[in-house]
Amino acid sequence: MSETKTPLGFIGLGVMGEPMCANLVRKSGHPVYVADISPEPVARIGALGGHACASIIEVAQTTEIVFLSLPSIVQVEQVCTGPGGLVEAAGRVRIVVDMSTSDVGRTRRLAEVLRGHGILLILSLIHI
């Protein structure tokens, strides 16, 4: 019997996000679905074996766990609760792992909003 691996989502393929996502694609053994406002890093991750998505909604409808690597809490809020975001997609997402540098108070408020939609927000800061 073959084991089905949980599909993972990754949104934000910038300077830090793209290499982290590339490692997930290469080493995790999970299918990884990606989205970014810029098509170039999406294409590069696709060339490594990631699945390019045209929108956040497509990521949300395909994955249960989504990693975010975004510039600030502003973009995190937009991706999670804005138009075309994870909440609006009413997809499969149950866990969001935010690796962005975000304001603590706003992150706590966002966690409460997401919890109301059955989504757990995990803050996973990256220190360099």
Where are these regions (language model features)?
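A short linear hydrophobic-aromatic micro-motif
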Residues: 54, 123-124
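Rossmann-fold NAD(P) dinucleotide-binding segment
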Residues: 56-68, 73-120
